[in-house]
Design a protein with these regions (language model features):
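Divalent metal-binding pocket/active-site signature
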Residues: 40-41, 114-188
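Hydrophobic faces of well-ordered beta-strands that scaffold small-molecule active sites
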Residues: 30-34, 61-63, 84-89, 122-123, ...
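H/E-rich (His + Asp/Glu) clusters that bind or coordinate divalent metals
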Residues: 175-280
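Active-site gating/metal-coordination segments in enzymes
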Residues: 69-150, 198, 205-206
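Active-site beta-loop-alpha junctions enriched in small/polar residues
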Residues: 35-37, 66-67, 89-93, 125-128, ...
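Acidic/histidine-rich helix-loop elements
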Residues: 34-45, 94-101, 209
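Mid-to-C-terminal alpha-helical segments outside catalytic/metal-binding sites
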Residues: 2-5, 10, 20-33, 41-65, ...
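Alpha-helical scaffolding within the catalytic cores
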Residues: 45-48, 68-76, 104-110, 157-161, ...
Length: 280
């Protein structure tokens, strides 16, 4: 097929690519890893945050903040164009990252926050290796399962498997999809934990190659498991807020290489399905 317009002849394959790219420019995105922590709040007011979301086509977020006040503010804003899915952050201050899993006061924090009545998950939390075997971590896992909450775990594979051993019914969003775990191993873990494990893609290495294009391994992984991935910004430091536009421009660039149905699921469809939300 060829299209002739203004004297220009475009082969059908080129035209299809242009249509796909335009579609991904318009696609809605759900940011499944958004922190509104203490540090950026003096620099980025709620109105400025809203403007950032609008210009990047963000229509939903997982909000997880340190302290949780940042998430409270995002919930209280009640912006009609944005679905906010709040997660409990088990941190009061940044140093809790290193100790939360043995601090009984953190469990009290989780219970106190949960009493607000709107939370859908716990995390993002950091846990590595055998630290996940602590009694407190098991209590958190069981608490989540009993209340149908997701966990958002920044962890290595060893800790991930321990979380599932604590309670096989747990539902985990794996922050960064293991950073550098091989695509083949990611596929194995998805198969082993069908309906219980999803991968969030911020900071994930290897998705694109030196030419900026999707690698064959990740193209194949997205083809097989497009229903298991989520996008995220991970605004853990102010620089990530500064780079927000660039982060999502890059996501849109490689989403445009995927079939439209795969791109739509990864961009927002999976998050909407997981949290029982409808498109606006």
């Amino acid at each position: 097929m060829r299209i002739v317009s203004a004297g220009v002849v475009l082969p059908g394959v080129i035209l299809a690519g242009l249509f796909a790219a335009c579609a991904q420019e318009r696609i809605e995105i759900f940011d499944a890893h958004l922190h509104y922590n203490q540090e950026p709040r003096p620099l980025y007011s709620l109105n400025e945050v809203r403007d950032i979301f609008r210009r990047n086509g963000i229509t939903g977020i997982i909000a997880t903040s340190r302290p949780n006040k940042g998430t409270h503010e995002l919930m209280d804003a009640k912006w009609p164009e944005l679905r906010v899915v709040p997660f409990i952050r088990p941190y009061r201050v940044r140093s809790d990252i290193q100790t939360w899993f043995n601090d009984q006061k953190i469990f009290e924090l989780i219970k106190s926050e949960y009493a607000r009545g709107y939370y859908r998950g716990i995390g993002e939390f950091h846990i590595y290796g055998k630290s996940a075997q602590s009694e407190l971590v098991k209590r958190v896992v069981d608490f989540a399962v009993e209340r149908n909450l997701f966990l958002h775990a920044h962890c290595d594979e060893e800790a991930l498997l321990i979380l599932f051993r604590h309670n096989p019914k747990v539902k985990i969003i794996w922050a960064h999809t293991g950073f550098s775990v091989s695509p083949a191993r990611v596929a194995e873990l998805f198969d082993e934990h069908s309906g219980a494990l999803w991968g969030e893609l911020s900071y994930r290495g290897g998705i694109t190659g030196g030419d900026g294009k999707l690698t064959s391994d990740w193209r194949n992984l997205f083809a097989r498991y497009s229903d298991r991935f989520l996008l995220g910004s991970d605004t853990w430091i102010n620089e990530r807020w500064f780079a927000y536009d660039t982060i999502f421009k890059e996501y849109r660039r490689w989403l445009a290489e995927l079939p439209a149905d795969q791109a739509q699921r990864i961009a927002s469809g999976n998050a909407l399905r997981l949290f029982g939300l409808r498109r606006q």
